[in-house]
């Protein structure tokens, strides 16, 4: 990303919807005039445990690594769809999507068609809300070509853009 690039008022196409896009799209909303997000596959998205640690917690930070290792083990056992944890994974991701995306069509586009854990699980608190904005469009039709003026999908969707970003 060029350090001198100013996205203000620009029409931007974000090609991809994985980890980079999950960070980039919310950052560009409200700055760019329009975002077209080109998605090939939906991702499993979990809440991002973001926030400040309270002062009382700081002495326990050393033990945190062990806690996260234990949680990782527990988490990986939940990738089996038949397990209680697997059902919990599905319930959490489904609830998160329903609570943040009201449009059923957009929600369907954002629902993974594979078992959780088959692809990288992403963490974000603001990606889904960013995609519900009027100035953001999620495009799931395959890209047919990239022209000097923008990205064109197989169904001819897409519009002129001033910058394409591979994410």
Please describe what each predicted stretch is.
Residues 1-4, 113-116, 136-154:
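A conserved short coil-to-beta-strand element within the FAD-binding core of flavoproteins
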Residues 1-102:
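Rossmann-like dinucleotide-binding core of oxidoreductases
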Residues 6-10, 157-167:
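Core beta-strand elements of the Rossmann-like FAD/NAD(P) dinucleotide-binding domain
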Residues 106-118:
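Helix-loop-beta segment of a Rossmann-like dinucleotide-binding subdomain
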């Amino acid at each position: 990303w060029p350090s001198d690039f100013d996205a203000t008022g620009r029409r931007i196409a974000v090609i991809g919807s994985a980890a980079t896009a999950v960070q980039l799209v919310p950052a560009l909303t409200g700055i760019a005039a329009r975002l077209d997000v080109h998605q090939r596959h939906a991702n499993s998205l979990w809440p991002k445990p973001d926030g400040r640690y309270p002062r009382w917690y700081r002495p326990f930070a050393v033990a945190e690594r062990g806690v996260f290792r234990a949680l990782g083990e527990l988490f990986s056992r939940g990738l089996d769809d038949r397990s209680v944890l697997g059902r919990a994974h599905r319930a959490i991701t489904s609830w998160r999507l329903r609570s943040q995306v009201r449009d059923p069509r957009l929600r369907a586009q954002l629902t993974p068609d594979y078992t959780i854990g088959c692809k990288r699980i992403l963490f974000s608190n603001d990606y889904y809300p960013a995609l519900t904005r009027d100035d953001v469009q999620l495009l799931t039709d395959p890209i047919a070509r990239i022209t000097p003026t923008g990205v064109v999908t197989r169904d001819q969707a897409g519009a002129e853009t001033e910058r394409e970003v591979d994410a």
